[in-house]
Amino acid sequence: ATPSNTVYPGNPNGYESPETTHYSVVDQWGNAVSVTTTINLSYGNGCIVEGAGFFLNNEMDDFSAKPGVPNAFGLIGNEANAIAPGTRPLSSMTPTIVMKDNKPFLVVGSPGGSTIITTTMQTILNVINFEMDIKEAVCAPRFHSQWLPDVIQIEPRGLSQDVLSNLRLRGHKIIYRGGYIGESNGIMITSEGLFGGGDCRGETSAIGY
């Protein structure tokens, strides 16, 4: 985190990302936390709390304000996720701790709006099914599908041409996503110690002391 006494008025792009934040932490005793925090869209709802200096979120967009109409992330909801008293909206945030033998094995998560779920799932599968180390797992190419719109989004280097051809033969529509999908980070806990991985796509990094 950036110490508050080093933040001054000016161009915030040098020290602050416009997207959701995720961090994974494990301490010397093996306690693990996976935290995803967000104000949803850039600048939240655009209102600053007077005297406090922070933006209010616009997480109301995670509700289906108008069933059948996509929200800011292209997700199409229905009446089950409608705005109503005493309810909470659906969220794509997926801070995750994977257990193995009743102990934390993976601590992972990502920013990325509606791509968070697929990003986190692919990171976990990369470790468990494809036996990657955590750095390889968070940096590997990714794809995303959220049912509606019914397309498969891929990064420019996301899938091989033979896989793309087979998907198209099965009737899938493939589109190239501008930019990257997610920005995962994670920690793998083994008998040999802790191994951290920061996604190559952005400013994510792994540190330990």
Features from the language model and the residues they span:
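C-terminal catalytic domains of large/alpha subunits in multi-subunit enzymes
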Residues: 1-17, 29, 62, 82-92, ...
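Internal maturation/activation junctions in enzymes
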Residues: 1-38, 51-52, 59, 66-70, ...
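A short acidic/small-residue loop/turn micro-motif
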Residues: 40-42, 112-113
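A short, polar/charged loop-to-alpha-helix boundary motif
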Residues: 42-55, 118-122
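Extracytoplasmic/secreted cell-surface and envelope-processing proteins
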Residues: 44-45, 65-66, 116-118, 162-163
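Short, charged/polar low-complexity linear motifs in solvent-exposed/disordered segments
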Residues: 50-53, 74, 123-126, 154-157
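Signal/transit-peptide handling
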Residues: 54-82, 96, 104-105, 115, ...
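Short, charged, low-complexity patches
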Residues: 113-121, 134
